[in-house]
Amino acid sequence: MPAIGIDLGTTYSCVGVYQHGKVEIIANDQGNRTTPSYVAFTDSERLIGDPAKNQVAMNPRNTVFDAKRLIGRKYDDPKIAEDMKHWPFKVVSDCGKPKIGVEYKGESKRFAPEEISSMVLAKMKETAEAYLGESITDAVITVPAYFNDSQRQATKDAGHIAGLNVLRIINEPTAAALAYGLDKNLKGERNVLIFDLGGGTFDVSILTIDEGSLFEVRSTAGDTHLGGEDFDNRLVTHLAEEFKRKYKKDLRSNPRALRRLRTAAERAKRTLSSSTEATIEIDALFEGQDFYTKVSRARFEELCADLFRNTLQPVEKALTDAKMDKGQIHDIVLVGGSTRIPKVQSLLQEFFHGKNLNLSINPDEAVAYGAAVQAAILSGDQSGKIQDVLLVDVAPLSLGIETAGGVMTKLIERNCRIPCKQTKTFSTYSDNQPGVSIQVYEGERAMTKDNNALGTFDLSGIPPAPRGVPQIEVTFDLDANGILNVSAKEMSTGKAKNITIKNDKGRLSQAEIDRMVNEAEKYADEDEKQRQRITSRNALESYVFNVKQSVEQAPAGKLDEADKNSVLDKCNDTIRWLDSNTTAEKEEFDHKMEELTRHCSPIMTKMHQQGAGAGAAGGPGANCGQQAGGFGGYSGPTVEEVD
């Protein structure tokens, strides 16, 4: 039984299978090799694909599309609010998650985006089964490289709902690179930039392809909310305003008229890729009024100018992350229907100083082609040219946990190869602490408040011990689908707990991802200052507690009472100062450290305990996690990183 590759797109989906040594892209029952990602609900039936899109003007409120723009997001995501202005169907909040409300067979129904996507996936599965003449369960499904953990998990869930065993979730540009590398029989080592601009998402990935068989992703960047639909929206707004200006009627209140206008705008956009002018003719568009107009390519380019320019920022970022300059890129490969737009091509060509773009692979089918190859590899196909293929992908965002002072301590860095596993040792933050709370984040900023919380779990039952003594091993395991599993283990008792980060944790909005990554560069200096400030605070805190503990536990006769009281008074003063100056600057912490060292060092030297005291308590380090259960009534962080 063969495995299939599915490109689940925002506007169109495509399915392929690898057999007899080649990939076949499978046509649907209408004879089309791509299927609209549309689902319609009527009084009598549910329609998927071409039939759903064909009846959209008659039934706009109950025809659902763009599920990929909703999947794995929260209802209050500003991007969803923006999209809702353009959608004729109703999106409602269900416990903070978006649900789509439709009328089906006379009843009101609510569907999650995963359910709508699963219906499209089921259609692709049926298309493949009809062609192959047997039932299919195994599949590889593609997602934008910049999809976060929640969106990947939700896509995988959609596959399961559709009755598929999802062998792997792979990144769309990586799949396209696989198609390009195998199709072109590349020789030697080549750096390839995949520019993937589809109906709703945009990705840039740079790969090094060695002898057409080793595919190593060097970097990835993008915007999960930029694509052909956004260009359509600009054109629809322009045409609706022209209609209002000409006829003093606002058609935007009428979903059917707006849908007919959108269909005409999409057709005009496609025409403008090959002609310099497109004609729009719609009979009885609104209140019996016909609408005839022309749109020039120049006007369309002006309407979308900022969106087109925005495609170059991720290209620059991908080059920077891959540590390459423009001249080191051998091939620029265009993927996704929106790369047919001449202005997008010319901007990219100018950016690369006139270098020719590679237009030799089918931009609509390349991703499904690569997914089909990966499906064959994962199901054990050893035939021909795919037997030596090795694919090495990367994590799109850094992953870590919160340590004292709200610092993001990264365990897995952005653009790190996947699958990967990283372990770090942390400890408790206060004496006799019975448990720790591990808070998991993704993002690029230095402080967790600027990143996105993925999940949290508590590890309890830690035996009573001084702060810094228990050893808690935290392991991040990022699987080949880009889905994260986190575990924590207390080494002396062997107690362990783990969590798979799922999309029910109140996940990241795309606006936040964009902000995190883009602002990380802008605020690098500020982040570094904040990091240093927290490091200085932690060093002072660690030192003062270690000194205090050493003096309190000093054997009788090792230290005279006056010295002991002098050190304890100074330590208690410092602790009080720390409690009332939590937001002090780095210089203030450093000054206090000098003052305390000057006062305590001579006395500690007398004791011959300087090194031993610090060692016993685990030394200065970063501290981790907000306390979940309020252990011992202490409300601060509850784990400490061990050097």
Curated annotation (Swiss-Prot):
Residues 611-643 are annotated as: Disordered. One of its GO terms (molecular function) is ATP binding. Belongs to the heat shock protein 70 family. Changing A617T: In strain: DSR 3. Most strains have three copies of the gene coding for this protein at chromosome locus 87C1; two tandemly repeated Hsp70 genes (Hsp70Bb and Hsp70Bc) and one in reverse orientation (Hsp70Ba). Some strains, including that sequenced in the Drosophila genome project have three tandemly repeated Hsp70 genes (Hsp70Bb, Hsp70Bbb and Hsp70Bc). PANTHER family: HEAT SHOCK PROTEIN 70KDA. The lineage of its organism: Eukaryota, Metazoa, Ecdysozoa, Arthropoda, Hexapoda. Residues 612-635 have a biased composition (Gly residues). It comes from Drosophila simulans. InterPro entries: ATPase_NBD, Heat_shock_70_CS, HSP70_C_sf, HSP70_peptide-bd_sf, Hsp_70_fam. Induction: Heat shock induces the synthesis of seven proteins at five otherwise inactive sites in the polytene chromosomes of fruit fly larvae. Two separate sites, producing two and three copies, respectively, code for the 70 kDa protein. Keywords: ATP-binding, Nucleotide-binding, Stress response. Coiled coil: none annotated. This is Major heat shock 70 kDa protein Ba.
